[in-house]
C-alpha cells in the first residue's frame, strides 16, 4: 500500500512550484553548463564538467523526490478543520514554562516543515507531544536539546 504524505494546500503548492522551477529553469541551465564544460576538452580532469554533472545529479534526485511526494500527497484543507484538540494543521500557541517565552507553531507534513516560518513536522518531538492535547494542557517535550515544558494557550485553524 502506498503511504500517503499529509500536507497543507500551501505546502503542496510550494512543492509543485519548486518542481516546476527545477524542471523548466534549473534542468536546462545545468545541461547548458555541462555542454559548455564538455567543450573545454579532456573530461577526466575537467573540474567544471564534474561539478556540473554533480549539480545535475542533485537536481534530478530532488525532482524525483518532489514527484514522489506530490504523487503521494494527501492534501488536508486546514480551513475546514475545527475543534480544540490538536491535530495535523493546527496552529498552536505555547508558553515556555521556564522562560515565559511565547512560541507559535503550525503542525504540518515533513515535506513542508520550516522552523524559521513557524512550521514543524508532525513527526517532530514537539508535534508528537502536542497531538491530542487541548488548550490549557501542559506538555513536556524531550528533544535533542533536553526536556522542555510548555503550556498550550491557544489552538487555531488557519
From Swiss-Prot:
Residues 41-61 are annotated as: Disordered. InterPro entries: GreA/GreB_C_sf, TF_GreA/GreB_CS, Tscrpt_elong_fac_GreA, Tscrpt_elong_fac_GreA/B, Tscrpt_elong_fac_GreA/B_C, Tscrpt_elong_fac_GreA/B_fam, Tscrpt_elong_fac_GreA/B_N, Tscrpt_elong_fac_GreA/B_N_sf. One of its GO terms (biological process) is DNA-templated transcription elongation. Pfam families: GreA_GreB, GreA_GreB_N. Necessary for efficient RNA polymerase transcription elongation past template-encoded arresting sites. The arresting sites in DNA have the property of trapping a certain fraction of elongating RNA polymerases that pass through, resulting in locked ternary complexes. Cleavage of the nascent transcript by cleavage factors such as GreA or GreB allows the resumption of elongation from the new 3'terminus. GreA releases sequences of 2 to 3 nucleotides. Belongs to the GreA/GreB family. This is Transcription elongation factor GreA.
